[in-house]
From Swiss-Prot:
It is found in: Cell projection, Cilium; Cytoplasm, Cytoskeleton, Cilium basal body; Cytoplasm, Cytoskeleton, Microtubule organizing center, Centrosome; Cytoplasmic granule. The gene is Cep20. Belongs to the CEP43 family. This is Centrosomal protein 20. Residues 1-104 are annotated as: Necessary and sufficient for homooligomerization and localization to centrosomes and pericentriolar satellites. InterPro entries: FOP_dimerisation-dom_N, LisH. It comes from the Eukaryota. Keywords: Cell projection, Cilium biogenesis/degradation, Cytoplasm, Cytoskeleton.
């Protein structure tokens, strides 16, 4: 006769094999967060940079079907339930896409772009920027000096095809 411990182990193993265990854990976390969330407490005002970053993360989470994580992000940050339009994000971030790159999150293309740029030469210098008086449109994007601009980030099939291959494995 099986013990309670044996039964628990079999159920846990079955749920893990079916890919349900992670979803259940995420759902429980989201429900606990929702129950503990104090809706009377105002959410912080997001800077333009934080809003764009959160939207990029939300798009990434949606693409990967991390819906519970996305719901926690939305609740915790005070993001609107309706995501910003992708064309608005690409315009604000000075991103140029091709048809293939439009099928993956912008964040994938940005990471792929900078990984390729890193292979082609020295790393881009990252400037410490105060978010109080800046938006993404006027943050210097030069490789090694503040006055040069590398131009728009080109998200092309080359920069996103690895993401497609990984996604469909």
């Amino acid at each position: 006769m099986a013990t309670v411990g044996d039964l628990k182990a079999v159920v846990k193993d079955t749920l893990e094999k079916r890919g349900v265990m992670g979803q259940l854990k995420a759902r429980v976390r989201a429900e606990v967060f929702e129950a503990l969330d104090d809706r009377s407490e105002p959410k912080p005002v997001l800077s333009p940079e934080n809003l764009l970053i959160n939207e990029l993360i939300r798009e990434y989470l949606a693409f990967n079907k991390y819906s519970y994580t996305s719901s926690v992000l939305t609740a915790e940050t005070g993001l609107s339930e309706v995501p910003l339009d992708r064309s608005f994000l690409t315009k604000e971030l000075n991103v140029v896409e091709d048809l293939n790159s439009q099928s993956v999150p912008i964040l994938y293309g940005i990471v792929a772009h900078f990984l390729k740029e890193h292979e082609d030469g020295p790393c881009q210098k990252v400037e410490k920027v105060s978010t109080e008086n800046h938006t993404f449109r006027n943050i210097p994007r030069g490789r090694n000096t503040k006055d040069t601009h590398s131009g728009p980030v080109q998200l092309t099939q080359t920069s996103t095809e690895d993401w497609h291959q990984r996604r469909h494995r």
